[in-house]
Amino acid sequence: MGIKVYKPTTNGRRNMTSLDFAEITTSTPEKSLLVSLKNKAGRNNNGRITVRHQGGGHKRHYRVIDFKRNKDNVEAVVKTIEYDPNRTANIALVHYTDGVKAYIIAPKGLEVGQRIISGPEADIKIGNALPLANIPVGTVIHNIEMKPGKGGELVRAAGASAQVLGQEGKYVLVRLQSGEVRMILGTCRATIGSVGNEQQSLVNIGKAGRNRWKGVRPTVRGSVMNPNDHPHGGGEGKAPVGRKAPSTPWGKPALGLKTRNKKAKSDKLIIRRRNEK
């Protein structure tokens, strides 16, 4: 998928780019796989903001994605490659030979008419899903399960990929996109190939209004707020923070504080941290 560059007809259009959507084969989604999606604008059930900078944006339907890929030994044909407003990756509509329809994350190189299959004996081909223990060392994978049968949780964003490094007993060593190397149970499933739409990260938004279409609201600096709104607020003119270190709006240390649970049981499964050189 290529990048479309706009002419600088206005200040907002200057340097603006977008995807050309050349890979998209249809603009009409499969109706049976759509679910209504209510705009919560970052609020919880008490009406309080729990996620800032969310609200507005275009109405969307949620596309039900098959992250489990547990329909073993039933072949499916790729019918369409579609845009999904709820994620950076594109999705593919597949029709199984038994009549079931499903959406999957569209890997790079997947084409309409291609046949895919899931199961322990599936071939190592783009779009096929199988247990990690059955995938050869060096294979590029995505949509990786953390727990058997739960569905893919890792490596689902546009352009993301991971690689199988080896096997130790019942665990498989996987290098993730961040550089982290961790052990995952060999019975967990993954899909062959990297996620498509890899040029999505190169798009220049160009103007604030385009982010508002996506439901992203402005981010305001704490230093320009009032002292009752943010620890950095108040003072006369451009005042400094007034603390030992920058803080979050809730008074906790910002910039570099480790938030991971020090007693996390999964620590023993992480062989190499993402920030280790």
UniProtKB/Swiss-Prot annotation:
Q: Which GO terms describe its molecular function?
A: rRNA binding; structural constituent of ribosome; transferase activity
Q: Where do the record's region annotations for Disordered lie?
A: 218-277
Question: Which SMART domains does this entry report, sorted A to Z?
Answer: Ribosomal_L2, Ribosomal_L2_C
Q: Which family does it belong to?
A: Belongs to the universal ribosomal protein uL2 family.
Q: Which UniProt keywords apply?
A: Ribonucleoprotein, Ribosomal protein, RNA-binding, rRNA-binding
Q: Which GO terms describe its biological process?
A: cytoplasmic translation
Claim: Ribonucleoprotein is one of the keywords in the record: yes
The record's annotation in InterPro entries points to: NA-bd_OB-fold, Rib_uL2_dom2, Ribosomal_uL2, Ribosomal_uL2_bac/org-type, Ribosomal_uL2_C, Ribosomal_uL2_CS, Ribosomal_uL2_dom3, Ribosomal_uL2_RNA-bd_dom
Q: What is this protein called?
A: Large ribosomal subunit protein uL2
This chain's source organism reads Streptococcus uberis (strain ATCC BAA-854 / 0140J)
Function, as annotated, reads: One of the primary rRNA binding proteins. Required for association of the 30S and 50S subunits to form the 70S ribosome, for tRNA binding and peptide bond formation. It has been suggested to have peptidyltransferase activity; this is somewhat controversial. Makes several contacts with the 16S rRNA in the 70S ribosome.
Q: What is the lineage of its organism?
A: Bacteria, Bacillati, Bacillota, Bacilli, Lactobacillales
PANTHER family (alphabetical): LARGE RIBOSOMAL SUBUNIT PROTEIN UL2M (PTHR13691:SF5), RIBOSOMAL PROTEIN L2 (PTHR13691)
